[in-house]
Amino acid sequence: IRDRSSLCENMFTTQTFQSVIAVNLKDCTSIEEAIQRSIKRIEGSCISIGYVKPGSVELISRSIGSTHAINSSGDIYFDVVCSAEIFNPRVGDNISCVVEKVNKLGVMAKGEDDLPVCVIIARQHHADSFQECNPDDVIKCEVVGSRFKVKDREIQVIGKFV
């Protein structure tokens, strides 16, 4: 029996990134708590470098707050440096996934072990030997391409059977 949690864990890498956090004075009982709440909001969604694993964001450093004269909202802006577990599949990576639907266009699958991916395996990538599979089958695919937008809850992947 393989360790299912380690398969998903190996897909994430620890990365450090920089961001600007706006803290409104109305929400400010403690500046540290307000900053922590703001950086926790990115967990479980995509940022510019990939999907952020829930519970993995850590604040490394922050600047002193500054205000912008143009902005009348009263927000205080902080430059923060954080580290987090990030998932961003590259071309050639292998992903294990569970088949959801099969139709004449191909296969639609979700990442196994709660991996935040929606995988589409098109028949056009398998002209002669398209592997027949059924819903709930576990398959392995190779990433041909991927895309996501900021705040997406999963990464869309085009794959082919391995």
Task: Indicate residue ranges for each PLM-predicted region.
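Single-stranded RNA-binding regions, centering on S1/OB-family and related RNA-binding modules
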Residues: 2-162
